[in-house]
Amino acid sequence: MSKSPKHFLDINELPLSELKSMLDASSAMKAKQKAHQPVRPLEGKTLAMIFERPSTRTRVSFDVAMRQLGGEPIMLTGAEMQLGRGETIADTARVLSRYVDAIMIRILNHDALLELAANATVPVINGLTRRSHPCQVMADLLTYQEHRGPIEGRTVAWTGDDNNVLASWAHAAERFKFQLNVATPPELAPKKAMRDWIKASGAPIMLGTDPEAAVRGADCVVTDTWVSMGDKEGEHRHNVLKPYQVNAKLMSLAKPDALFMHCLPAHRGEEVTDEVIDGPQSVVFDEAENRLHAQKGILAWCFDAVK
């Protein structure tokens, strides 16, 4: 009997030991790549990359990651796939499983991701959904670890609105046991399902509306663009979110050596000022690079190639 595939769908679905092994593998492979000693454990493997919408960072980072590991990526767009509109998602999963060795999908509908994973016989990786963005937060955790050491016991502050990146930060807080302080406008706060999960899981997460209270004494300050994928509200959201901008005054409330993170692309002058994103505490381009390295760790883990 063949064993079940190792899916990477959400951070809170995996044991801490597995998550740490991915980060350790990411660090090791990054060091090898920088030393011109590439590790190629995925020779002969093929990754299908499904994109419902155009993508830059996710597409390039997964493409390069798979190639650096010795494998071959194949890109499929939503227009080519007609995912769930012609052939069912379940049948698509079964067919692709006969052709490729793993599937990475970037799709808004999280339930479609779950259906794909339930029917695939090869590993499925969540490249992003409207509900969560675990690959990004694994890159963020790797970045924090590189600059400041283990994140356990530290304090991370999120200021802005509720979105998929915040959800994955919440999942990480529950697993890695760091304090997550969240500040959002009341109308853009985490929804009931997330609030219920926080309560049930006992995750060390504080939800509030005051950005200064959230950031005070933090080791890391995180924000994201105020208009997420698919959002059509514009001016109203910006007006509501103005008090949540990360600027020099807000950063001064965090610890002196606090890091600033943003998954990019950033709307400068909106959720963050130039002074902060270009300042000495900002690690946003390290985060962007670490999408590549973190995803190499995830891919290697999916194929049982983590040493």
UniProtKB/Swiss-Prot annotation:
Q: Which GO terms describe its molecular function?
A: amino acid binding; ornithine carbamoyltransferase activity
Q: Which reaction does it catalyse?
A: carbamoyl phosphate + L-ornithine = L-citrulline + phosphate + H(+)
As for family, the record states:
Belongs to the aspartate/ornithine carbamoyltransferase superfamily. OTCase family.
Organism, scientific name? Bradyrhizobium diazoefficiens (strain JCM 10833 / BCRC 13528 / IAM 13628 / NBRC 14792 / USDA 110)
Record's superkingdom? Bacteria
Q: A Pfam family name for this chain?
A: OTCace_N
Q: Where does L-ornithine bind?
A: N164, D224, S228, M229
SUPFAM superfamilies, alphabetized: Aspartate/ornithine carbamoyltransferase (SSF53671)
GO annotation (BP), single: L-arginine biosynthetic process
NCBIfam families, per the entry: orni_carb_tr, PRK00779.1
Residues binding carbamoyl phosphate are S55, T56, R57, T58, Q82, R106, H133, P134, C135, Q136, C263, L264, R291
Pathway entry = Amino-acid biosynthesis; L-arginine biosynthesis; L-arginine from L-ornithine and carbamoyl phosphate: step 1/3
Transferase among keywords:
yes
The UniProt keyword set, sorted, is: Amino-acid biosynthesis, Arginine biosynthesis, Cytoplasm, Transferase
**For this protein, what is the EC number?**
2.1.3.3
Provide the function of this protein: Reversibly catalyzes the transfer of the carbamoyl group from carbamoyl phosphate (CP) to the N(epsilon) atom of ornithine (ORN) to produce L-citrulline.
Where found? Cytoplasm
Name of the protein in question: Ornithine carbamoyltransferase
**Residues spanning the membrane:** none
GO CC annotation, single: cytoplasm
Its gene is argF
| Disulfide-bond pairs as recorded | none
